[in-house]
Amino acid sequence: MIRLRRGSLYRLLRDWIADGRGVAATEFAFIVPLMLVMFFGTVEFCSAIAVNRKVTLMARTLSDLTSQSPSVADADIATFFTVTNKIIWPYATGTLNPYFTSPSSGTISELYVDQTTKQARVIWSKGSAPRTADTYVTTVPSALLVPGTYLIFSEVSYQYVPTVGYVMAKAGVTLSDVSYTRPRQSSCVLYIAGTTTPSSPCPTT
C-alpha cells in the first residue's frame, strides 16, 4: 500500500512537471507589465523630443521676428509672443499676459557687445522673466562677441509633464533653448517705451 501510494505520488509529480498547460499564460502575465512600461516610456520620450524641438523653434521664432523690426514697442513684442506661443500646439500652450507663462516662459533681450571689454550687456529686455538692463550675459558664444555690434537674444523654456508618471518624474522636466540673431533692418532694434522714441539711434549705455 505504501509503495503504491509512493508510486502514485511520483507519477502525479512527474505528470505535473511535464504538464506544459498554462505556461504561456504565466509567461504573458509576467511580460505584460514590462511591455506596458516600455510602450508608455517610448510614447513619453517621443513626446518629450517633439516638445523639445518645438521649444527650439519657439526660441528661434521669437528672436527672428524681433530682429526683423527696426524698432519695437510693447504691443509689437506682445504680438511676437502670441505668434510664438502657437508653435507648441497641440501641447499645452502658455498663458499670455501679455508674455507667455506656465507651462511656457520666455524672454527677449537686446545685447550690446562692448567695444573695450567685448562683453554682452543688456540694453533692454522683455518677457516673463526679463533681464535687468546694464547687466552682462556671460553665456554668449565667443564667435558672436563682435565689438560694437548688437544681438537679439531669446530664451524659452517649457515644463513638460508626462501623461503617465512611471517613466519620467510626475512633476515633469524643463526643456529650454536660446537663440541669437543679428538685427536685420538696422544696426540695432530700438525699444520704444510708450510714445517716446529714443534720441540715440542705437544706445550703447
Where are these regions (language model features)?
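Short, conserved structural patches
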Residues: I2-R3, R60, S67-T205
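Alpha-helical assembly-interface signal, strongest on the long, hydrophobic N-terminal helix that forms
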Residues: M1-P90
